[in-house]
């Protein structure tokens, strides 16, 4: 089987950079494509990381322009986010940016799609009164619904609060997640990147699924087998 060609939307983010490096180091994948929004980021990924890069600002690019950027790839990962840069960008990046990439995948005939969402995004009762996060969750919930309604072989990953510690490779079993404690659950960004890789490598276990991700005590391999 030929190595999988993966395009990463939001490659300049913290999870995206970790993911690009993991894909580059894994022989199951071809050189990944970093989709970024500034020329400086293009130069960084091409010259310092040693991967391909496309200057495609999903906020302002058309669906056709995004399609042209990704059409040669087998799978797309959406890890872009507004990153606390204002409510307007939550809707133009986290929501409409995701929807445009989904439409571009459909237009390009790309089936495999992995998106990084947020823990319990579908549960309005959980997040509606969390101060400062309501708009973020509205965007994530709505984007996830568009993904589910697409014809893509999607995986929706819903991580807890993202941490910068070194990855542990250990996750909390889904049947051990306590609903009341969810607001305090966290996961290292490196583990999110690692799970994206594993999702791409194990489509039979992850396609058409929404998966909560928080750090725990179960090895990632066993976690995937339980899905």
From Swiss-Prot:
Pfam families for this protein: NAD_binding_10
GO cellular component: cytoplasm
Coiled coil: none
Subcellular location: Cytoplasm
Record flagged with keyword Cytoplasm: yes
The keyword Transcription regulation appears for this protein: no
Domain of life: Eukaryota
Keywords from the UniProt entry: Cytoplasm
Family: Belongs to the UPF0659 family.
PANTHER family: FLAVIN REDUCTASE-RELATED, UPF0659 PROTEIN YMR090W
Miscellaneous section: Present with 704 molecules/cell in log phase SD medium.
Protein name stated in the entry: UPF0659 protein YMR090W
Species the sequence originates in: Saccharomyces cerevisiae (strain ATCC 204508 / S288c)
């Amino acid at each position: 089987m030929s190595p999988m060609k993966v395009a990463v939307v939001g490659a300049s983010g913290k999870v995206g950079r970790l993911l690009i490096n993991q894909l580059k180091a894994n022989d199951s994948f071809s050189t990944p494509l970093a989709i970024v929004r500034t020329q400086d980021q293009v130069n960084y990924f091409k010259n310092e990381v040693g991967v391909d890069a496309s200057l495609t600002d999903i906020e302002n690019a058309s669906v056709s322009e995004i399609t042209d950027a990704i059409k040669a790839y087998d799978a797309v990962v959406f890890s872009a986010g507004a990153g606390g840069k204002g409510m307007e960008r939550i809707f133009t990046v986290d929501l409409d940016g995701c929807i445009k990439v989904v439409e571009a995948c459909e237009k390009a005939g790309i089936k495999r799609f992995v998106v990084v969402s947020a823990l319990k995004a579908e549960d309005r009762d959980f997040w509606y009164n969390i101060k400062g996060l309501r708009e973020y969750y509205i965007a994530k919930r709505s984007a996830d619904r568009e993904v589910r309604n697409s014809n893509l072989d999607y995986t929706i990953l819903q991580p807890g609060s993202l941490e910068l510690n070194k990855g542990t490779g250990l996750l909390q079993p889904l049947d051990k997640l306590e609903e009341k404690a969810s607001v305090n659950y966290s996961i290292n960004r490196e583990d999110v990147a690692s799970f994206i890789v594993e999702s791409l490598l194990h489509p039979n276990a992850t396609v058409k699924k929404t998966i909560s991700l928080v750090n725990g005590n179960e090895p990632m391999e066993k976690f995937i087998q339980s899905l």
